[in-house]
Amino acid sequence: MSLDIAKYPTLALAENPEELRMLPKESLPKLCDELRQYLLTCVSRSSGHFASGLGVVELTVALHYVYNTPFDHLIWDVGHQAYPHKILTGRRDRISTIRQKDGLHPFPWRGESEYDVLSVGHSSTSISAGLGMAVAAEREGKGRRTVCVIGDGAITAGMAFEAMSHAGDIHSDMLVILNDNGMSISENVGGLNNHLAQLLSGKLYASLREGGKKAFSALPPIKDLLKRTEEHLKGMVVPSTLFEELGFNYIGPVDGHDVHTLTQTLKNMRDLKSPQLLHIMTKKGKGYAPAEKDPIGWHAVPKFDPASGTLPKSQSSLPTYSKIFGEWLCETAAKDSKLMAVTPAMREGSGMVRFSREYPQQYFDVAIAEQHAVTFAAGLAIGGYKPVVAIYSTFLQRAYDQLIHDVAIQNLPVLFAIDRGGLVGADGQTHQGAFDLSFMRCIPNMVIMAPSDENECRQMLYTGYHHNGPAAVRYPRGNGTSAVLEPLEMLPIGKGVLRREGEKIAILCFGTLLAQAQLAAENLNATLVDMRFVKPLDEELVLEMAAKHQVLVTVEENAIMGGAGSGVNELLMAKRRWVPVLNIGLPDLFVPQGEQDEMRSELGLDAAGIQRQIEAWLA
C-alpha cells in the first residue's frame, strides 16, 4: 500500500530531517497537519499504534528541525509514539508495513535506521541509556547532543528516577522531554506559561543563574535568598520542585501542540549545560476526535474506517484468555474478600476492567512498577491476604529478583497470572513471552502451570489461588478453543493427563499448542500427553511414557533452552533412562514480529511443523 504523496505537498518536501531543516519555519504548522493526516490514513489501512503518535507530531517536527539528527542522539522511550519519527526519517513509504512480518519494526530499532539510536519496547529505559550516551558524547568532544523523550506514565518507573538521580549527580549535558499527555502532573498550561518557559530557557537567564550561583556560593544567606527567589518565579509555572531536587533545570510546562513555541524553546535549551528537563503538555490522539475521546481504546488499533470513527469488533465469538482470567477474578472476589488483584499499568490488556470497577477496594494498579508490584504482593500475602499479580510474561522479566527474593524464598502464597506467554505477534522481539518457563523453572518453591485450553486455565487459576505457596499460571495472547467450562476444583499438583494412546512416539505437550500437537499425533499415531505442570513435573508419567515408547517429543511455546522440555531431559538423565528426546519450542533467537499463526508456521510450531520436525528427526 502506498499513498499519493502529492496530496501532502509540504510533507513531500521532508523525506528526511536534512530536508525538513531546509523548510521555512512558517511552513511547520502545515507540515504538522499533513503529517498527522498521513499517519491517520496509513494506520487506518494497515493497523498499528495510533493515539500516541498523533500526540507527538509537533514535538517530532520540532526536534528534527532544531537538532542535527542523526549526529545528535534522539531517544524515544517505549516507542509507541515513534511513527511520526519514522515517517520523517526516510521510512515514509514503508510505514504501512509497520508491525507486519518483514516490515518496519513497531518500535525504534537500531538495525533499521541510523536515526534509531536505541532499540526499545519496554518503558522507562531512555534516560539511563541517554545518560550513558551523554557521557560518551562528552568524552568524544564533538558537540553531540542527547535528547530523551519520555511519557508521564513511563517516568513514574523507578529506573527513570534512578537515572535522573545519577544524571543530576554527575551534571551531564542532556535534555529530557517529559511528554505529559495524561494531565497527571499539571494542568497549568497557557500563554503565560509558554512565555515564561521561553524566558527561563533562554541563554541570558541561564548565564545569570549559573553566574549568580558561583558569585554567591560562599555567602549562604544570599545563596538561599536567590534560590527562594528563583523558586518563587518558577512557582508560577512549575508544578513541583521534584526535578530540581534531582539536579535538573526544569522548564515548562509548554503547549506540546504549538510547534513554533516548541521550536523556539528547544533552540534556547539546545546549548544549555547540565541536565535539563522540558515539560510539555500534549493530547494523546490529537487531531482525531474519537482518539482524543478514548485514547486508551485507540492506543493500538486494527484497520478501521476513519470516517466512521469506530473500531471494528472482534470477529471471534470465543473469549480471550485475558477475559477468562478477568471473569475468574470477579467470580473469586465475589466469594473471597481476601483476594487482592495487582497490575503494573496493564488493566485493559490483562482483562481487569470489570474487576477494577466492581471491586475497587481489592484492585491495585501500581503503575509501571513491576518490581514494586511483586514485592507489594508479597507484603499483602504476609498480611494475610491472597494477592494475584496479573502481568505480561515479558514484563515479569523486570521483577525477577523480587520473584525470587521477596516471594519464593519466603514461600508466600502469591499467584502470578502470566498473560502473553509465548508468541505475541506484531510487537516483536521485545514483547515475545519466550523465557518465563525457563527463568521460573529453576526457582525453588514455585508451582508452574501451562493450560491447554480456557477450561484448564480456570482450573489452574483456582488451584494456584488456593495453593499455599507461590504459583504461576501461564497463558497466551488470543482466544480460547471453545472448551466447555467446568465447575472449579483443585487439580492434583504435578499431574498430567493422557489425551491419546499411540505407538512408538509419545508427545508431551506443555500449554496451548496441544491442539496442534493433537493433529500431529493423529497423523503419526503417537501418544499425546497434556503435561499441565511444568513444575513440579509429573515424573511418574514421564517415566511411564519413556518405558512404553521408543522416543519422546516435548512441545512448548517457550525457549527450548531451560524450558519444560529441558526438565524432561534432566529427569531422564537423572534416572538413567536412555530414551531419545526431541525438544520442540522456540529457537535460540529473539523472534521478530509477525502474526502469531504466521510465526508459528515459520518456526515449525503449527501441526504441520510439529509433524515435519518429528519426521525429519526420525529419518
UniProtKB/Swiss-Prot annotation:
Its cofactor is Mg(2+); thiamine diphosphate. InterPro entries: Dxylulose-5-P_synthase, THDP-binding, Transketo_C/PFOR_II, Transketolase-like_Pyr-bd, Transketolase_BS, Transketolase_C, Transketolase_CS. Pathway: Metabolic intermediate biosynthesis; 1-deoxy-D-xylulose 5-phosphate biosynthesis; 1-deoxy-D-xylulose 5-phosphate from D-glyceraldehyde 3-phosphate and pyruvate: step 1/1. The keyword Ribosomal protein does not apply. GO terms for molecular function: 1-deoxy-D-xylulose-5-phosphate synthase activity; magnesium ion binding; thiamine pyrophosphate binding. Its EC number is 2.2.1.7. Binds 1 Mg(2+) ion per subunit. Binds 1 thiamine pyrophosphate per subunit. Mg(2+) binds at D152, N181. Coiled coil: none annotated. Pfam families: DXP_synthase_N, Transket_pyr, Transketolase_C. CDD domains: TPP_DXS, TPP_PYR_DXS_TK_like. Keywords: Isoprene biosynthesis, Magnesium, Metal-binding, Thiamine biosynthesis, Thiamine pyrophosphate, Transferase. GO terms for biological process: 1-deoxy-D-xylulose 5-phosphate biosynthetic process; isopentenyl diphosphate biosynthetic process, methylerythritol 4-phosphate pathway; terpenoid biosynthetic process; thiamine biosynthetic process. One of its GO terms (cellular component) is cytosol. Gene3D superfamilies: 3.40.50.920, 3.40.50.970. It is an enzyme of class 2 (transferase). Thiamine diphosphate binds at H80, G121, H122, S123, G153, A154, N181, Y288, E370. It catalyses: D-glyceraldehyde 3-phosphate + pyruvate + H(+) = 1-deoxy-D-xylulose 5-phosphate + CO2. Belongs to the transketolase family. DXPS subfamily. Homodimer. Catalyzes the acyloin condensation reaction between C atoms 2 and 3 of pyruvate and glyceraldehyde 3-phosphate to yield 1-deoxy-D-xylulose-5-phosphate (DXP). This is 1-deoxy-D-xylulose-5-phosphate synthase. It comes from Yersinia pestis. The gene is dxs.
